[in-house]
Amino acid sequence: MELEIITEGRTPLKVPKTRGQPSARDPVFYNPAMQLSRDLTVSSLVQYGPKIVCDPLAGVGARGIRIAVELSPEVVVLNDLNPRAVELIEENVRLNDVEDVCRIENRDANALMHEDELAGRFDYVDIDPFGPPVPFLDAAVRTVRNRGVVGISATDVSALAGRYPRSARRKYWVEVERVEFYQEVAIRALISYIVRTCAKYDLAFEPHIAFFQRHHVRVIGEIRRGARRADRALKRLGYLLHCRECGYTSEREFDRECPRCGSGSVVRLGPLWLPDFADRERAERAASDARELGLEEAAELLETVAKETGTNPWAYDIHRWASRLGLSRVPSLTSVLEGLREEGFNAVRPHYSKRAVVKTDASPEEFEAVLTEVAGDSGCLHR
């Protein structure tokens, strides 16, 4: 295995030299494309100041060692079942001179979280698997302390985003189909599963920061103990009904016939987390911390996540809506955002899209009215 030394944030790391897309079959797994995700995690955790940290699926140790170096906790437990990964973790711990902070284990991740001497006392537990987090989630939410924080990643977004609805049904117990705001659905489906997993143990989950980035979903949030809190969290789950024909979307239940166009092409998505998937103050503070750490791309993404709060749990694709409405010209994203804001709506391009997509608190009817009006006097958007 050929190695190279790279630097993430302020942390040098010895990693496998990559040739092509990383695979679970690699001798030791490391995905350089996930550096931004790790930047976002470190930035988001500054405000919590975790002292006791668990990284049970550490790989080369990138995430956990970055936390050890950049956040100065008291203890970081780094674990991987792969002996070759453990050897590389040991090298990276020595490389960063954090032997006094890091404890390295070579165990099954679930066994570690259930049986470690610090089980139940962790301030932060990070679950970043290759694939779904489902096999590790029960142990993770139970090993963190009351009011502790978990960071959960899912890379099987093809399931969460509705491309493979049967897979989503089996793994996450959620009904999803591919819709134009599939990234939004994926984030909310994962949060829903975390909430339902916590509720089994009389635990409540509150998402603080969530994002969809490079084909994975990441959620960071707080665990609280108590059956009543768990009940309240469950009440925040619900369904979205979306018409494939006209794009109408609503949280309100209606018959399978769309109330806007009368089409029967309505899909029911859920149960999903329907409130904001981020806390505005937490996201803004994380953005500020990212900037102080010199992580500019992470700061910009977190600022956008903060701006998305207070909008609908879906998004509008300007091109698709213009086509459905038969508009002769497609208005620019900027003109649509400005038009919505002039009418008093919150409006932003979501963090997960580079296309002409809008998140807003405007209803479908209100969005249609603004889009139609703006199309009459705006320039065209060419893509």
UniProtKB/Swiss-Prot annotation:
Stretches assigned to the Trm1 methyltransferase domain: 4-371
Keywords assigned: Metal-binding, Methyltransferase, RNA-binding, S-adenosyl-L-methionine, Transferase, tRNA processing, tRNA-binding, Zinc
InterPro entries linked to this entry: SAM-dependent_MTases_sf, Trm1, TRM1_arc_bac, tRNA_met_Trm1_C
Organism in which the protein naturally occurs: Methanopyrus kandleri (strain AV19 / DSM 6324 / JCM 9639 / NBRC 100938)
Taxonomy, superkingdom: Archaea
Pfam families: TRM
Annotated binding of Zn(2+), by residue: C243, C246, C258, C261
UniProt lineage: Archaea, Methanobacteriati, Methanobacteriota, Methanomada group, Methanopyri
Molecular-function annotations in GO: tRNA (guanine(26)-N2)-dimethyltransferase activity; tRNA binding
GO biological process: tRNA N2-guanine methylation
Chain residues that bind S-adenosyl-L-methionine: R38, R63, D80, D108, A109
Residue ranges the record marks as coiled coil: none
Family listed: Belongs to the class I-like SAM-binding methyltransferase superfamily. Trm1 family.
Catalytic activity annotation: guanosine(26) in tRNA + 2 S-adenosyl-L-methionine = N(2)-dimethylguanosine(26) in tRNA + 2 S-adenosyl-L-homocysteine + 2 H(+)
UniProt-recorded name of the protein: tRNA (guanine(26)-N(2))-dimethyltransferase
Protein's UniProt keywords contain Ubl conjugation: no
Record function comment: Dimethylates a single guanine residue at position 26 of a number of tRNAs using S-adenosyl-L-methionine as donor of the methyl groups.
EC number(s) stated in the UniProt entry for this protein: 2.1.1.216
KW Ubl conjugation (keyword) present: no
